[in-house]
UniProtKB/Swiss-Prot annotation:
Phosphoserine: modified positions: 226
Organism: Mus musculus (Mouse)
Gene name of the encoded protein: Cs
PANTHER family in the record: CITRATE SYNTHASE (PTHR11739), CITRATE SYNTHASE, MITOCHONDRIAL (PTHR11739:SF8)
High-level lineage: Eukaryota, Metazoa, Chordata, Craniata, Vertebrata
Protein known as: Citrate synthase, mitochondrial
Positions that bind oxaloacetate: 356, 428, 448
Localization terms from the record: Mitochondrion matrix
Residue positions where N6,N6,N6-trimethyllysine is found in the record: 395
Length: 464
């Protein structure tokens, strides 16, 4: 038990994480994120070195044949510092729950939702930032946001039938021309300095992503109209919504919430694991994140909210917009009895309602309580879990984040469902790139697990 507790400390539980304590003692007045990191990293390197010396041979868990054939589900095999997924409480960012982040992270003047800049600071340092630190990040990203001309030209020349995620991945890969890390590595550099150049690349990439994403949106859906210029007085999300062409302050608030809650979800999901794996080869952040986006583009990872909207639209066509609970129950049972699933319900890890769903529901109750699509989502929330429990197949009958996000985007006029995964990708950069900085700071090696063939596995089992 003591060893498990020690492992939990390493992974960042709020009440025991030395990293959080160190962060709170690290130049709390500094608004320069790199300076704060420079203070934190040697302490964390020493802490982990001692931990490995004392417990390096400790067995953390067992691996079963089912795990090997089942996508390594539940297998403990990664160290990922920025977030931990609790089956009952949901995601914790450096130990803080989503409700705690909503309450404690700085907000825009007159706003009610957390600023994603603040979450990035928290993910990188383990420390709740001040308003001044968040403002520094907003200005810093605004300074770094300009796109090189070759990337603009490439985006402008993509065919309109090229999927938005393909465009995003290609543009991020092309931004590799700007990599500080790749240049320094080619010239020969001390590995102790890796994290510093990775940090610079991650900051540049996060700054440029809204410009790339907005350009893709304008080219595909707004006849190639200009995204305009970055305003250094505005926060990251506000600049993003301006470049997309949306001026409703409520949509900007939604984007702040969306970009915050989709940012990170532990290290085992496809996009997070991909960036970690590719980064372990010392590929620069642009190449690592582009690979992550190719994983996110897969229908089993990043297309779930799109599938929810398609299903909701089909439901409305078949039973009408003002459907009774009884008719809705019949429709859901017909869906399940035909071998299909109710999209947006269930999760690989969670065993309660996804807190990311809950905070979006609260946003909708506040801003769009009479919207027909939201009312349908709320009605499903009341009915579906009980049916899934009655059916007896689902381990988790509760809604996840994807059951709600598309409805909110549709309400504010963003109806282009093929684009939704791009928004997800912009958000996910905050988490996986924060971790990438720490992966290089802590000297994580090339990832190289052992594989086995089915014949080899059978022989191994027979020998037991």
């Amino acid at each position: 038990m003591a060893l498990l507790t020690a492992a939990t400390r390493l992974l960042g539980a709020k009440n025991s994480s030395c990293l959080v304590l160190a962060a709170r003692h690290a130049s709390a007045s500094s608004t320069n994120l790199k300076d704060v990191l420079s203070n934190l990293i040697p302490k964390e390197q020493a802490r982990i070195k001692t931990f490995k010396q004392q417990h390096g041979k400790t067995v953390v868990g067992q691996i079963t044949v089912d795990m090997m054939y089942g996508g390594m589900r539940g297998m403990k095999g990664l160290v990922y510092e920025t977030s931990v997924l609790d089956p009952d409480e949901g995601i914790r960012f450096r130990g803080y729950s989503i409700p705690e982040c909503q309450k404690m992270l700085p907000k825009a003047k007159g706003g009610e939702e957390p600023l994603p800049e603040g979450l990035f600071w928290l993910l990188v340092t383990g420390q709740m930032p001040t308003e001044e630190q968040v403002s520094w990040l907003s200005r810093e990203w605004a300074k770094r946001a300009a796109l090189p001309s070759h990337v603009v030209t490439m985006l402008d020349n993509f065919p309109t039938n090229l999927h938005p995620m393909s465009q995003l991945s290609a543009a991020i890969t092309a931004l590799n021309s700007e990599s500080n890390f790749a240049r320094a590595y080619a010239e020969g550099m001390n590995r102790a300095k890796y994290w510093e150049l990775i940090y610079e690349d991650c900051m540049d990439l996060i700054a440029k992503l809204p410009c790339v994403a907005a350009k893709i949106y304008r080219n595909l859906y707004r006849e190639g109209s200009s995204i305009g210029a970055i305003d250094s007085r505005l926060d990251w999300s506000h600049n993003f919504t301006n470049m997309l062409g949306y001026t409703d302050p409520q949509f900007t608030e939604l984007m702040r919430l969306y970009l915050t809650i989709h940012s990170d979800h532990e290290g085992g999901n496809v996009s997070a694991h991909t960036s970690h794996l590719v980064g372990s080869a010392l590929s620069d952040p642009y190449l690592s994140f582009a690979a992550a986006m190719n994983g996110l583009a897969g229908p089993l990872h990043g297309l779930a909210n799109q599938e929810v909207l398609v299903w909701l639209t089909q439901l409305q066509k078949e039973v009408g917009k003002d459907v009774s609970d009884e008719k809705l129950r019949d429709y859901i049972w017909n869906t399940l009895n035909s071998g299909r699933v109710v999209p947006g319900y269930g999760h690989a890890v969670l065993r309660k309602t996804d807190p990311r769903y809950s905070c979006q529901r609260e946003f909708a109750l506040k801003h769009l309580p009479k919207d027909p699509m939201f009312k349908l989502v709320a009605q499903l929330y009341k009915i579906v879990p009980n049916i899934l429990l009655e059916q007896g197949k689902a381990k988790n009958p509760w809604p996840n984040v994807d059951a709600h996000s598309g409805v909110l985007l549709q309400y504010y006029g963003m109806t282009e469902m093929n684009y939704y995964t791009v928004l997800f990708g912009v958000s996910r950069a905050l988490g996986v790139l924060a971790q990438l900085i720490w992966s290089r700071a802590l000297g994580f090696p090339l990832e190289r697990p052992k594989s086995m063939s089915t014949d080899g596995l059978m022989k191994f089992v027979d020998s037991k």
